[in-house]
């Protein structure tokens, strides 16, 4: 039983460490990175360029998984898009 608990704990820890964060990529103005008129696969490429594991076009913006902590993702609370 103790072994099973230890095994499950290790799996959860691996998911936390390896999983990374997820969210919408931001452009240089702090807005979500648009994929509205981009070709298929654009968001996946952009996400992997940022060292993410994968990504897709969550119309109309790129959403990424497995991003490292240094990558800034869009957050409603700190949204600066269109504001000066």
UniProtKB/Swiss-Prot annotation:
Residues 21-82 form the LCN-type CS-alpha/beta domain. Pfam families: Toxin_3 (PF00537). One of its GO terms (molecular function) is toxin activity. It comes from the Eukaryota. One of its GO terms (biological process) is defense response. InterPro entries: LCN-type_CS_alpha_beta_dom (IPR044062), Scorpion_toxin-like (IPR003614), Scorpion_toxin-like_sf (IPR036574), Scorpion_toxinL (IPR018218), Scorpion_toxinL/defensin (IPR002061). It is found in: Secreted. Residues 1-19 form the signal peptide. Disulfide bonds join 31-81, 35-57, 43-62, 47-64. GO terms for cellular component: extracellular region. Has the structural arrangement of an alpha-helix connected to antiparallel beta-sheets by disulfide bonds (CS-alpha/beta). Beta toxins bind voltage-independently at site-4 of sodium channels (Nav) and shift the voltage of activation toward more negative potentials thereby affecting sodium channel activation and promoting spontaneous and repetitive firing. This toxin is active only on mammals. Is toxic to mice. This is Toxin Tst1. The lineage of its organism: Eukaryota, Metazoa, Ecdysozoa, Arthropoda, Chelicerata.
